[in-house]
């Protein structure tokens, strides 16, 4: 029976049958990360485990497929493919001889079931690419080494030792399918299942290939050149058609999805296409104004600080942010001003600041009434006693 060949999809993902979509997605991500072939290079079974997890997720993440699976189990794969109710589309029984004809049509034979030995598309792969902020902002070209499953060169995908051939499966007679008969109130119900001996292949390998150990497929590393466009950010996905795992039995290869992860930068904070950086100036520079050099992604640049600049003020440098992923041009760089107050002052610096405070009529620590009067007297003397 098929139950021996295929595990329950809920069991594979480790979730209850009433699991929510979010719980199913979370379980899939955790298991996919754990059993990804890239992270299990020394485990030859990781690729099959990863494929099993992906197959379970493809069904349970789709509401229609999940509903059919909950009702029919793995037999849902044989009942109308991507369709729903196998009786859907028939308005009545006038064109048929009776109930026996109808049941024979739907349940009576394997001729109308899909061929389990047909071409199978290769699995999609996902690769996380780490980038610096500058690489993400301007774009770059990266050469990746991506593990993927391909046909074995020794046996050319047959799984059999060179000089031998797979033999016809004795259980299904080479059809790849077996019939399971059930008796219901309507009569006999014949369900066509995938053969658990050959797993739908129709043939079995008696003398396995020493290279792939009878699997017909091996894991290799392919070199892939990726052109990363400017403006990508963490989570951006690039699709490379045909760079996934090789298909089975002449099926097309899957796709490779490159997922970007941009490393944090100690100088810049990113918000969309704009960048933010903080630069420090003295309180005297803030009061009187100055010109300072700041870092940008393009290199150092001189900016003007206007007099009277306050802490937290921002100076915008247009076109100095990241490239826009969609559209042309670049974002802006926002320079946030931080004003530093000196921790220690020389005696002369202190005197000068006290004089400034007196001129502005501000009372500060260290200013005595006598000092304040003495300073005012000096000012009057300087102005001719007026």
Curated annotation (Swiss-Prot):
Zinc finger residue extent: CR-type: 139-221
NCBIfam families: DnaJ_bact, PRK10767.1
Primary localization class, coarse: cytoplasm
Species this chain originates from: Symbiobacterium thermophilum (strain DSM 24528 / JCM 14929 / IAM 14863 / T)
Pfam family, one: DnaJ_CXXCXGXG
Keywords: Chaperone, Cytoplasm, DNA replication, Metal-binding, Repeat, Stress response, Zinc, Zinc-finger
Stated family: Belongs to the DnaJ family.
Gene Ontology MF terms in the entry: ATP binding; heat shock protein binding; unfolded protein binding; zinc ion binding
Entry text on domains: The J domain is necessary and sufficient to stimulate DnaK ATPase activity. Zinc center 1 plays an important role in the autonomous, DnaK-independent chaperone activity of DnaJ. Zinc center 2 is essential for interaction with DnaK and for DnaJ activity.
UniProt cross-references to InterPro entries, sorted A to Z: DnaJ, DnaJ_C, DnaJ_domain, DnaJ_domain_CS, HSP40/DnaJ_pept-bd, HSP_DnaJ_Cys-rich_dom, HSP_DnaJ_Cys-rich_dom_sf, J_dom_sf
Subunit structure: Homodimer.
Cofactor(s) it depends on: Zn(2+)
Name of the protein: Chaperone protein DnaJ
Gene coding for it: dnaJ
Subcellular location: Cytoplasm
A biological-process GO annotation: chaperone cofactor-dependent protein refolding
Domain J: start-end pairs: 8-73
Residues holding Zn(2+) 1: 152, 155, 209, 212
Free-text remark on how the cofactor is bound: Binds 2 Zn(2+) ions per monomer.
HAMAP family to which the protein is assigned, alphabetical: DnaJ (MF_01152)
Record-linked PANTHER family: CHAPERONE PROTEIN DNAJ (PTHR43096:SF48), DNAJ HOMOLOG 1, MITOCHONDRIAL-RELATED (PTHR43096)
Upper lineage: Bacteria, Bacillati, Bacillota, Clostridia, Eubacteriales
Coiled coil: none
UniProt repeat feature CXXCXGXG motif, residue ranges: 152-159, 169-176, 195-202, 209-216
């Amino acid at each position: 029976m098929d139950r021996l060949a295929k595990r329950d999809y809920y069991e594979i993902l480790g979730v209850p049958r009433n699991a929510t979509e979010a719980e199913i997605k979370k379980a899939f991500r955790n298991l996919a990360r754990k059993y990804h072939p890239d992270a299990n290079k020394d485990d030859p079974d990781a690729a099959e485990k990863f494929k099993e997890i992906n197959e379970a997720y493809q069904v349970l993440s789709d509401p229609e497929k999940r509903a059919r699976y909950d009702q029919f189990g793995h037999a849902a794969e044989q009942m109308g493919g991507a369709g729903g109710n196998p009786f859907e589309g028939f308005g009545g029984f006038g064109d048929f001889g009776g109930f026996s004809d109808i049941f024979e049509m739907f349940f009576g034979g394997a001729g109308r079931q899909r061929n389990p030995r047909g071409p199978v598309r290769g699995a999609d792969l996902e690769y996380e690419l780490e980038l610096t902020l500058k690489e993400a902002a301007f774009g770059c070209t990266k050469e990746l080494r991506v593990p993927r499953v391909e046909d074995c060169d020794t046996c050319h995908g047959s799984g059999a030792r060179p000089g031998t051939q797979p033999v016809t499966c004795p259980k299904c007679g080479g059809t790849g399918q077996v019939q399971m008969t059930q008796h219901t109130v309507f009569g006999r119900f014949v369900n066509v299942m995938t053969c658990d001996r050959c797993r739908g292949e129709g043939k079995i390998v008696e003398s396995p290939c020493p290279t792939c150990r009878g699997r017909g497929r091996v894991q290799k590393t392919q070199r892939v050149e990726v052109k990363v466009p400017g403006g990508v950010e963490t989570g951006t996905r690039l699709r490379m058609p045909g760079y996934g795992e090789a298909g089975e039995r002449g099926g097309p290869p899957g796709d490779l999805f490159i997922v970007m992860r941009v490393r944090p930068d100690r100088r810049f904070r990113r918000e969309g296409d704009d960048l933010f950086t903080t630069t420090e100036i003295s309180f005297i520079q803030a009061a009187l104004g100055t010109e300072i050099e700041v870092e940008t992604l393009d290199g150092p640049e001189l900016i003007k600080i206007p007099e009277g600049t306050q802490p937290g003020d921002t100076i915008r440098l247009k076109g100095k942010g990241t490239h826009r992923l969609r559209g042309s041009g670049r974002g802006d760089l926002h320079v946030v001003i931080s004003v530093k107050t000196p921790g220690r002052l020389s005696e002369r610096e202190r005197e000068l600041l006290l004089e400034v405070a007196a001129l502005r009529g501000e009372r500060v620590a260290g200013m005595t009434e006598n000092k304040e009067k003495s300073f005012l007297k000096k000012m009057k003397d300087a102005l001719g006693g007026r």
